[in-house]
Amino acid sequence: MKNKIFHTQDLCLRTNLRCAKNSARMEIIMSEKVSIGILAVQGAFAEHQAMLDGLGADTFLIRQKKDLEEAVQNGRLQGIVLPGGESTVQGKLLRDLGMSDQLKELIEAGTPVLATCAGLILLVERVSNDDRAYLKTLPVSVKRNAYGRQLGSFVTDAEITHVGTYRMNFIRAPYIDEILDLQVETLAIVDGNTVAVRYKNQLALSFHPEVSEDARVHAYFLNEIVQGV
């Protein structure tokens, strides 16, 4: 099957997604339609789904254990999104719904994952200001609500390695306060704090790219992590 190549500018026109004027050139290279499961127990899953659908991915929602199991059995799970929201609620629901162990196993086995804000907290090995930890697949430590609660939310422009200058939306956001493995790649720093990292198959962000009109973070996830382009 011939690869489909879309320039970011074309994608913006086709999906009403905005490209920053100073953005690095990026392409979506789809050798086939990739299938991405989006955790949908709580949080901003619909926004992630709209962004990925606009980039040509085949998305589905993971609301309960059987959704995850069926996707694995059918070979339909090529990537996972853990959205922003409330990490304590999401973590409790994952345990109550019996999905924690399987998600952890899938991620540790190499299934690509994009985690934003609360999703980042679900992944990390340690939360420096909270005793609770969840999947523990990402060797970093984070500080929850590091910028304060709702009144501490803000928007800023900063550089993301491999992506370019990007407008970041921080909403009751954590930041990464310690890297625990030399293989963790820091992708973005804001005011001296690490806010985006990659570790093998895991892309984790403090901010919310799904509420942006800029699709480049999701494009990077599809290109470089899901498809390994």
Task: List the predicted regions and their residue ranges.
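Flexible, glycine-rich phosphate/dinucleotide-binding loops
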Residues: 45, 68, 122, 129, ...
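Hydrophobic anchor at the start of a short beta-strand
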Residues: 59-60, 113, 202
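Cysteine-nucleophile active-site neighborhood
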Residues: 86-158
